[in-house]
Amino acid sequence: LTIGQWLGLIAGRTIRKVTDITPLKGIERFFGGVLNLAACALVMVVLTISMRTVPIPQLNTALSESKTLSWMVASTPEVVKDRINTVRNDVLAFGTIPEVSQLIAPETSAPTQTVESAALDQAAASVVEILGAAEQCGYTSTGSGFVADNGLVVTNAHVVAGVTSPVVQDSRGRTWPRTVVYMDTEQDLAFISVPKLPLEPLNIGTNATAGSLVTFMGYPKGGPFKALPATVQGIGNTQTIDADTGRANAMRQVYQLAADVQHGNSGGPVLDENGNVVGVIFGRATSGQTGYAITASTLKQALAEGGDNTAAVSTGTCRK
């Protein structure tokens, strides 16, 4: 608030220099007050958007439960919120998103036509944000995830790598007790046990086919939540980087998507029009609007191997 008041004071003094020699002191006071209030509001919005990605459950809950702050952020134009998120990510370190250089299919532009259905609207409630402090690497990790079974959240291994206490935050800003119970750094999949999470599991579907129009959901750039369209350009084998060792993995099956994937989308679901999960976002190309996702068949195999785990596992080391 001090910064906002200071900005308003400067603006007010500038106006006063003019109004002191005119009979407009009443108007000057009015507009000075408006500028002061607007500056204070802007500072509060910037702080709220910036601080909600800090992995402190008490702070996350307090910000989400404040009706005034929630209204102010909701009333802020999207272009302003996007700019705040971009600046925040430029100033603060939020980990990395894997980049894939080997193309499976020719690249095309990301679609602009969105897929709308009641099933997708319902599925959005089961998509969560993952926050965590990777102390070894000195950054805050942000990513996405989704409920795949009762009390079980799926995300990427690189999202929680080196994070001892990840925070699972739902669309209402509530945070939940959690434990990482599965890590597969080769396939870049991790499971988080959240026993009290009151969200419906999403159905795991079958692999999508080339040319399919799908929707990917998550919290790009640390939020807010977005559901964006994508086209499956192809499905095939490519080489990716191990989330723990940093070395190249063996060839594995992935989707190549025409999609505007950003940091923070990692771990979010790719869904068909019926709300079925057909993939999990994990990376993007080195340039252009091309993203990559783990296939539904790979996810099903991982769930069969570790979906019932309850014991905590090591999250390994983070990668700068």
Set out the residue ranges of the language-model regions.
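Conserved active-site neighborhood of the chymotrypsin/trypsin-like protease fold
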Residues: 134-142, 149-226, 309-314
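Sec-exported extracytoplasmic/periplasmic mature domains
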Residues: 16, 35, 52, 216-219, ...
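Second-shell loop/turn segments in exported
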Residues: 105-106, 117, 135, 199-204, ...
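Alpha-helical transmembrane segments and their juxtamembrane interface "caps"
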Residues: 1-112
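N-terminal activation segment of mature serine protease catalytic domains
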Residues: 63-144, 165, 302-305, 309-320
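Active-site region of chymotrypsin-like
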Residues: 125-131, 190-201, 226-319
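Short secondary-structure boundary/capping segments
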Residues: 119-120, 181-182, 206, 246-247
